[in-house]
């Protein structure tokens, strides 16, 4: 396969993925090209790719510098925007001595908080003058999309300087009421460390720093919040509690009391997200858990009593907080998701089942009683 053929082949696959509203394209040796739609991977060709195919396809979407970096490090992250097709985040890697790629769709239209259907309290969080807001979720849970919607809201509703440090830049934000500076690691700066070190010299109001991966990145995030900036970041975890545990475990035992004090003073919000298949089969809906740093939450963080936070969240919906199970109950009650999917994604299956049994109007509906639903409340 020649480079021109490889470029056309990739573009045809990307067009197909876009036409099916797919989220990811998988290129791997000894397996046909495949796309993920609504969380399910589907082959799009009967013919497996050879190792030579995957190598040629990867090189076809890379610049010469990226090819050299990939050969040296065996990893490469970048974004591409083939004309008339869209924008995609690319991760190239080696697995079992062979080249593989995953190409993720980045919508060209910026998402909005209203359009995503996420809680309105995120608008308030996004407009905070200072503090740390961390978006939590597994890979593919929509963290980057929600974060882009939050940045766009701030861009439209304030006047300041927003800086993003990303690897790679995903959503491209135009200047609206804010100046938006987007820096890509490897393209606009040599490293995360160099970019983050110099960020405070660029007079920012909001700093989006991508993923918190280690202690050093976490230290930068806290420092940005302490110096009067709003810092937005992501973290791989399944819930607010798990995220706090993971952050604490970044640090050695002797550093943790200081960390807990810093978090208690500077954390603004912890937003956890999961994508649940919609009942009508048309896409997925976001179930969002929100922890806001109220005085009571702050005190629990300071003391290290992280395990007690979820109970406070359950009782603080009037303040804008909610747990995953409360979000799932609301989505089920609104006929957005099925009973099975609600329970499948619950933090506490028994608690959610009981909540639906006792409080759900949908569960008491005639349709359910007549057996037209394919589940039973027990």
Annotate each predicted stretch with a short phrase:
Residues 1-378:
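Short, flexible helix-loop junctions that flank or precede catalytic/ligand sites
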């Amino acid at each position: 396969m020649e480079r021109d053929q490889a470029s056309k082949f990739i573009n045809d696959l990307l067009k197909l993925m876009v036409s099916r509203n797919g989220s990811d394209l998988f290129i791997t040796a000894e397996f046909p090209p495949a796309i993920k739609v609504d969380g399910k991977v589907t082959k799009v060709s009967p013919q497996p790719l050879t190792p030579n195919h995957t190598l040629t396809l990867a090189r076809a979407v890379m610049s010469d510098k990226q090819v050299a970096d990939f050969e040296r490090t065996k990893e490469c992250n970048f974004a591409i925007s083939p004309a008339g097709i869209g924008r995609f985040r690319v991760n190239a890697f080696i697995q079992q001595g062979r080249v593989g790629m995953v190409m993720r769709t980045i919508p060209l239209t910026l998402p909005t908080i209203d359009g995503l259907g996420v809680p309105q309290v995120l608008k308030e969080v996004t407009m905070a003058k200072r503090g740390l807001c961390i978006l939590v979720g597994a890979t593919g849970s929509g963290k980057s999309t929600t974060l882009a919607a939050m940045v766009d809201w701030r861009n439209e509703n304030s006047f300041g300087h927003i800086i993003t440090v990303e690897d790679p830049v995903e959503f491209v934000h135009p200047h609206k009421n804010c100046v938006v500076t987007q820096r890509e690691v490897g393209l606009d700066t040599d490293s995360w460390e160099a970019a983050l070190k110099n960020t405070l010299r660029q007079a920012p109001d909001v700093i989006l720093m991508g993923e918190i991966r280690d202690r050093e990145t976490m230290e930068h995030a806290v420092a940005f919040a302490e110096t009067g900036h709003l810092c937005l970041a992501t973290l791989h975890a399944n819930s607010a509690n798990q995220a706090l545990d993971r952050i604490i475990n970044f640090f050695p035992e002797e550093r943790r009391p200081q960390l807990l004090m810093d978090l208690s003073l500077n954390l603004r919000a912890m937003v956890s997200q999961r994508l649940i298949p919609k009942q009508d089969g048309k896409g997925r809906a976001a179930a969002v858990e929100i922890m806001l740093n109220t005085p009571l939450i702050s005190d629990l963080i300071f003391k290290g009593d992280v395990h007690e936070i979820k109970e406070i969240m359950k009782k603080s919906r009037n303040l804008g907080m909610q747990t995953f199970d409360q979000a799932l109950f609301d989505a089920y009650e609104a006929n957005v998701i099925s009973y099975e999917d609600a329970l499948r994604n619950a933090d506490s299956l028994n608690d959610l089942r009981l909540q639906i049994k006792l409080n759900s109007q949908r569960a008491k509906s005639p349709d359910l009683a007549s057996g037209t639903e394919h589940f039973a409340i027990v």
